[in-house]
Amino acid sequence: MPMTIADLRTITGRTYPARRRTQNLVGGLSPIQASNFSMGFVTLEPHGGQVPWHNQEQEEVYFILEGKGEMCLGAERSTIVGGQAVFIPPRVFHQLTNTGATPMKMIYCYGPAGDVAHWRQELEGTLPRAGTDAPTLPEGAQPQWTEPPQS
């Protein structure tokens, strides 16, 4: 099997309404495909770019490369900064918000591989809303992005 290389500089990725861009490094439209995990690079815009409150069947890790943000996981809320990683168990609601003045950059890895519903839900404006269709966010957390996509 020949070596396959994914070059972040050539992967366009997708921009989401919650002010982030996701570039698949393994899975999705990446030249690298795996059956046991997916991995990608995410840039959250300053002052509120977000991976909104959601859950998924896969276990996942976020590794923060640069920036500062708020990580919510179940009933917990914490500040997270570059150089830190957080484990996200399957089916646990979670949210990451950039609270800094510069872009936050992170890598996610989850398994098994496959698309996750929250990507489509966010693009369609159908994400379950915290406290209504989903558990409430931890006390004091940044609000969940629920604005519909701009047409």
Q: Could you say what each language-model-derived stretch is?
A:
Residues 91-92, 111:
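Short, surface-exposed secondary-structure boundary micro-motifs
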Residues 1-37, 51-52, 118-151:
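A short, N-terminal "cap"/entry segment at the start of jelly-roll beta-barrel domains
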Residues 48, 61, 68-70, 77, ...:
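Structural motif
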Residues 34, 103-104:
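Short acidic/proline- and small/hydrophobic-mixed sequence motifs that coincide with surface turns
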Residues 75-90:
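Short acidic-glycine-tyrosine-enriched beta hairpin
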Residues 104, 114-120:
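A short beta-to-alpha transition loop/helix N-cap that caps and shapes the active-site region
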Residues 36, 41-46, 55-71, 109-111:
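Short, conserved beta-strand element in jelly-roll/cupin
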Residues 51-53, 71-72, 88, 94-100, ...:
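Short beta-strand His + acidic residue motifs that chelate non-heme Fe in jelly-roll/DSBH
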